[in-house]
């Protein structure tokens, strides 16, 4: 009897796996730092003033993803993404020897969001709220730019090798419009990292907390369901 029950459970799971709805897609993103915080240590390092005001920056990137919906809960899904985001960062409005300038720090990251999604059909349009965790990994060296109305200069001030994985949360909503064999997707999302990227600056023995990323993103892509 136990064997029969076990076989029935395995068969039910197998059927569910086979019949599950799978979505794959790709999207490009464009956004800005909205709430990204430069640490007081970094403000002093770049401007000599921990009261320097933050400045806006824009970022861009793209990702591929897969979403898995079970037949007995067709609206509920789990989505795994792999993304690349360029120009994460923040800026400071500073004054140096009477000259006003903007100092920006930016970096490239690999992002791995794991999301719970919920599909809400509205006519032929699909609205999908989503929320989940994100793990980010800084890649390469950060870029530092000092810009005035007349000049712009880039500087190498260290690396982010000691940062490691950065945990965070991401939430948003996506709208899918059927076009051809799949759907054009447009979305809004907000990424909030929990810990800062750490700068190992030349000439300093200790690591410096550089900034904590908080990005608002707009996306446009295409998805196929199987």
Over which residues does each language-model region extend?
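A hydrophobic membrane-anchoring alpha-helix module
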Residues: 185-193, 223-225
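Membrane-embedded beta-strand positions in outer-membrane beta-barrel channels/transporters
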Residues: 59-65, 111-115, 170-172, 217-219
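Gram-negative (and chloroplast) outer-membrane scaffold detector with strong preference
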Residues: 28-32, 36, 64-147, 224-226
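Conserved C-terminal beta-signal and adjacent last beta-strands/turns
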Residues: 167-179
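Outer-envelope beta-barrel architecture signal
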Residues: 20-24, 74-80, 123-129, 180-184, ...
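Extracellular/periplasm-exposed beta-strand and loop segments of Gram-negative cell-envelope proteins
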Residues: 34-57, 86-109, 136-166, 170, ...
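Short glycine/proline- and aromatic-enriched beta-strand/turn motifs that initiate or cap beta-hairpins
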Residues: 19-69, 223-226
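Cleavable N-terminal export/targeting peptides
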Residues: 1-23, 226
């Amino acid at each position: 009897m136990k064997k029969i029950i076990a076989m029935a459970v395995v068969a039910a799971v197998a059927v569910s796996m086979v019949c599950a709805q799978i979505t794959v897609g790709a999207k490009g993103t464009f956004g800005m730092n909205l709430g990204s915080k430069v640490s007081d240590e970094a403000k002093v390092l770049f401007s000599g003033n921990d009261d320097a005001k933050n400045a806006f920056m824009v970022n861009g990137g793209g990702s591929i993803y897969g979403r898995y919906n079970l037949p007995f809960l067709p609206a509920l899904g789990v989505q795994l993404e792999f993304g690349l985001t360029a120009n994460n960062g923040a800026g400071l409005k500073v004054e140096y020897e009477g000259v006003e300038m903007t100092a920006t720090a930016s970096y490239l990251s690999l992002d791995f969001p794991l999301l719970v999604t919920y599909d809400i059909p509205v006519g032929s349009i699909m609205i999908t709220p989503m929320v989940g965790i994100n793990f980010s990994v800084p890649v390469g060296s950060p870029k530092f730019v000092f810009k005035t109305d007349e000049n712009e200069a880039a500087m190498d001030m260290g690396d982010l090798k000691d940062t490691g994985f950065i945990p965070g949360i991401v939430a948003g909503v996506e709208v899918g419009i059927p076009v051809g064999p799949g759907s054009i997707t447009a979305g809004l999302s907000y990424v909030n990292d929990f810990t800062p990227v750490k700068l190992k600056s030349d000439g300093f023995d200790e690591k410096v907390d550089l900034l904590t990323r908080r990005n608002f993103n707009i996306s446009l892509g295409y998805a196929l369901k199987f």
